[in-house]
């Protein structure tokens, strides 16, 4: 495999010295870029884009051509696993993902199997291999999955939800059914992420987008324990390097200590927590990723730079162990030049923190 020309992202995740704070953006390959919209139109639809290795690689690399980002992230979707389980995923205009055959009972859970990463999900592994080849060692490639809880919300609700009534009804009235589903999903995520690592992903991330809708007790039982199982099951060394794992629970700031105790290398932060507080609480155990509000990218350049400076100052001296990112995905109508201001500001303004 090609030697990495820029390994700052991996080094920061392992709390090793870097000369500036590395940065990437969640959803950095996406609709805010006109070139992405053109490639998606060429593919026909979103899943066709995901399933074409050359086009998936093209959109993964597009933001790196515009901005000096320190990592690439696989272009894919968190719903690939439930799709491969046969739930009939489609993306409906104006309403997001919809599953034609949602999980409603124990029989539905019993029916689904653990997808073969080099079978039903081989298109994802082909994309990882293609991206690694096309990156030519410029920056590391991040693989990812949704968390078992977050995947289960879509599978039980039948799509996106605001109130999560169906899955919470299952959680409170038939917890053994939900645990059986979550256990299958955890095994599927372990298999899927390990296959991504073998195919060339140099770090992995688990997105627990909906963990923050749970009570503290339910978060431990229905989300965190399954992410802990995933961390325990992952390949942690490959190609002679540590493969860092980042866990990100949106609205999970109250549970940082418990997340850090899973054995992950880094914890993702959304914008609702002060990074100085997060560092004081868990910075001795894990690296931190985050955590600018994506909406700041609508602001004029001086305001973007001011926010970057504030977050860097919050993390403070001894600045290794911080990967700068947004607190969630970049919004689709952000001007690309504002994303450029953000990335350049992180590099420029972080250098004094890395003497």
From Swiss-Prot:
NCBIfam families: hemE. This is Uroporphyrinogen decarboxylase. Belongs to the uroporphyrinogen decarboxylase family. Substrate binds at residues 27-31, 46, 77, 154, 209, 328. Its EC number is 4.1.1.37. Pathway: Porphyrin-containing compound metabolism; protoporphyrin-IX biosynthesis; coproporphyrinogen-III from 5-aminolevulinate: step 4/4. Homodimer. Gene3D superfamilies: 3.20.20.210. Catalyzes the decarboxylation of four acetate groups of uroporphyrinogen-III to yield coproporphyrinogen-III. GO terms for molecular function: uroporphyrinogen decarboxylase activity. Transmembrane segments: none annotated. CDD domains: URO-D. It is found in: Cytoplasm.
């Amino acid at each position: 495999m090609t030697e990495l020309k820029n390994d700052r992202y991996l080094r920061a995740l392992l709390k090793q010295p870097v000369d500036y704070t590395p940065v990437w953006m969640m959803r950095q390959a996406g609709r805010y870029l006109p070139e992405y919209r053109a490639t998606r139109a060429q593919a026909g639809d979103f899943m066709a884009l995901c399933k074409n290795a050359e086009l998936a690689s093209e959109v993964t690399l597009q933001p790196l051509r515009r901005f000096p980002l320190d990592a690439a992230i696989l272009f894919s979707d968190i719903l690939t696993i439930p799709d491969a389980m046969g739930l009939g995923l489609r993306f409906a205009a104006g309403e997001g993902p919809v599953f034609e055959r949602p999980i409603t009972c124990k029989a539905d859970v019993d029916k689904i199997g653990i997808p073969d990463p080099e079978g039903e999900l081989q298109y994802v592994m082909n994309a990882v291999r293609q991206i690694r080849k096309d990156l030519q060692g410029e920056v590391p490639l991040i693989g990812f999955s949704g968390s078992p809880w977050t995947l289960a919300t879509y599978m039980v609700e039948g799509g996106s939800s605001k109130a999560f009534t169906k899955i919470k009804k299952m959680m409170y009235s038939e917890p053994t059914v939900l645990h059986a589903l979550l256990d299958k999903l955890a095994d599927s995520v372990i298999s899927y992420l390990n296959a991504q690592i073998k195919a060339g992903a140099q770090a992995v991330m688990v997105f627990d987008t909906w963990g923050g809708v749970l009570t503290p007790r339910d978060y431990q039982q229905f989300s965190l324990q399954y992410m802990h199982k995933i961390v325990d099951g992952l390949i942690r060394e490959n190609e002679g390097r540590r493969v860092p794992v980042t866990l990100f629970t949106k609205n999970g700031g109250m549970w940082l200590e418990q997340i850090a105790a899973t054995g992950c290398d880094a914890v993702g932060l959304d914008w609702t927590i002060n990074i100085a507080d997060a560092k004081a609480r868990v910075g001795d155990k894990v690296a931190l990723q985050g955590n600018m509000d994506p909406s700041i990218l609508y602001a004029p350049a001086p305001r973007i730079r001011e926010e970057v400076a504030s977050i860097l100052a919050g993390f403070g001296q001894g600045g290794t162990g911080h990967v700068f990112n947004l607190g969630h995905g970049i919004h689709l109508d952000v001007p690309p030049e504002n994303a450029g201001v953000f990335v350049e500001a992180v590099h420029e303004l972080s250098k004094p923190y890395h003497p």
